[in-house]
Amino acid sequence: MQLTELIETTVTGLGYELVDLERTGRGMVCVYIDQPAGITIDDCEKVTRQLQHVLTVENIDYERLEVSSPGLDRPLKKLADFTRFAGSEAVITLKKPLDGRKTYRGILHAPNGETIGLEFERKKGEAAMLDFTLADIDKARLIPHVDFRSRKQ
C-alpha cells in the first residue's frame, strides 16, 4: 500500500480528513488533518499514536512524524474543500495566466459540476467572476480573518 493511501485510510478511519501530506528528504513525514469542529492537540496526539503504530507495522522508514491542523490559511486541494468553504475568502494561483494574471483573491462560490467560481474585484468596485477547475490550480488557500478586538462592549 502506498504511503499516502495508508495514511489517508488511517486518518479517515479515526474520523478526520487528510488535508495534506508532506515527506521531506530527511525522513520527516508531516500530516495535516482537519474536521468540521476543528483540530485540538488531543486530536493530533490520537492520530500520531495510531500512525506511529501503522507505520511500524507496515515497516515504513521515517525519522520523525508530525501531525497538525492545516492552520487558518489551509490549502484547498479537493473539490469537497471548495464546496465546504463556499462563501469564504481565498487566494487562487493558476498554473497559466488568465487575462494577464495568475493570482486572484476573492469569495469562493460552490462548485457547479467540476467548475469552481471565485468572485473578485477586477477594478475599483467592479466585480467579476473567475471560473476554473482543479486542473487549472497551482495553489489555493483560504484567507484567514482574525478579530483581535475584545468581545466586551
Curated annotation (Swiss-Prot):
GO terms for cellular component: cytosol. It is found in: Cytoplasm. InterPro entries: Ribosome_maturation_RimP, RimP_C, RimP_C_sf, RimP_N, RimP_N_sf. CDD domains: YlxS_C. Keywords: Cytoplasm, Ribosome biogenesis. It comes from the Bacteria. The keyword Transcription does not apply. Required for maturation of 30S ribosomal subunits. Belongs to the RimP family. This is Ribosome maturation factor RimP. The gene is rimP.
